[in-house]
Amino acid sequence: MLQPKRTKFRKVHKGRNTGLAHRGSTVSFGSIAIKATERGRMTARQIEAARRTISRRIKRGGKIFIRVFPDKPITEKPLEVRMGNGKGNVEYWVCEIKPGKILYEIEGVNEDLAREAFALAAAKLPFKTTIVTRTVM
């Protein structure tokens, strides 16, 4: 599972996921990519599940680039615990996703196979996505 090796602070505020993704919104490493069209959160488990789905579909064909990393800790209080008495313990890590963010890229496989793999991976994600290709200028 992906998570930071060390962080400056153990717990963070909830915050708001607003705006569009300007950084990480172009295909940089591969030839075809999957891009988020809605905002949401992607847990480390979801990142890994989608990665495994893509890699199983393309087998040994190409290279997968993961463009997201879960760097935000999410806390939960134990069951049947009264409110108050501080913030809960860190349970899992998420990555805040804004519309336009590139999630995964593939290089070295034909486009049909890559689209198939991304379609399977999109079913594992909690928001709508689209498939984009690199534009050469």
From Swiss-Prot:
Keywords: Ribonucleoprotein, Ribosomal protein, RNA-binding, rRNA-binding, tRNA-binding. GO terms for cellular component: cytosolic large ribosomal subunit. InterPro entries: Ribosomal_uL16 (IPR047873), Ribosomal_uL16_bact-type (IPR000114), Ribosomal_uL16_CS (IPR020798), Ribosomal_uL16_dom (IPR016180), Ribosomal_uL16_sf (IPR036920). It comes from the Bacteria. The keyword RNA-binding applies. One of its GO terms (biological process) is translation. GO terms for molecular function: rRNA binding; structural constituent of ribosome; tRNA binding. CDD domains: Ribosomal_L16_L10e. Binds 23S rRNA and is also seen to make contacts with the A and possibly P site tRNAs. Part of the 50S ribosomal subunit. This is Large ribosomal subunit protein uL16. It comes from Acinetobacter baumannii (strain AB0057). The gene is rplP.
